[in-house]
């Protein structure tokens, strides 16, 4: 359906698509935050990808972390698009292709980051508690398949965003917006919106968070009995998961609130005006991961040590530990 047909078939003002306006100070402040997040994130993740991908020994741990950095980078490269949108007071001038693709990447890489963190949590638990299973299945081929499946699922979950995003023109206000358009019938549109929000909340937040919390609870329980302190790779993952939840929880909470606020004009306006601020918090996660790595390494290293060498050692420590643990398994046990 063309943009003109969409314009003629829906009463856009009744949906509230074109009432979002901010003060110049707020828009400029948000744009500065987005710009800083973009610069810090792109540089930081590029450094991580460069060292892990091209300088260091390849291990399963580095394979997981480089995919996490890749997901963050793909998320970050479209932040300038959103920054322009905010600076232009939410008038969309960049065409429908960028409207669809930027939203698709935001959604896909949100899922990819969460699923990768979930997979890393499961990997940490199995590495610590199931030596036979690790010895048998912790192979590159198996992990490539799992990571490939994570990306395929994330892309599939991002397809609805790609499909429903539209550039909508208001002839009465002479404004354009990049919005999710679910059809002319309001009841159908609200139903589709609620389904998408519920899928995003359950599959992209509740289920992964439950698996992560369960994995870490079991890890803590196990550590109490084996009297073995967590390694630095475990600490890095824990910090990254904590920050992810802190940054993305407001986004999901706001989406759930929106399910109950669609019939209230005041609540709808509050939700709509909160979106840029909630997005700003979510964007921070993709930029802060490299800072988390450095922060944890500096806390656990000597003052004069090289940060990147220490990070490399932290990721390799887990591989060494896993190998040593597996070497304790008797050959008769392996052959069963």
From Swiss-Prot:
Residues 53-63, 123-143, 222-240, 298-336 are cytoplasmic. GO terms for molecular function: complement receptor activity; G protein-coupled receptor activity. It comes from the Viruses. The chain crosses the membrane at residues 32-52, 64-84, 102-122, 144-164, 201-221, 241-261, 277-297. The keyword Protein biosynthesis does not apply. GO terms for biological process: phospholipase C-activating G protein-coupled receptor signaling pathway; positive regulation of cytosolic calcium ion concentration. This is G-protein coupled receptor homolog FPV027. The lineage of its organism: Viruses, Varidnaviria, Bamfordvirae, Nucleocytoviricota, Pokkesviricetes.
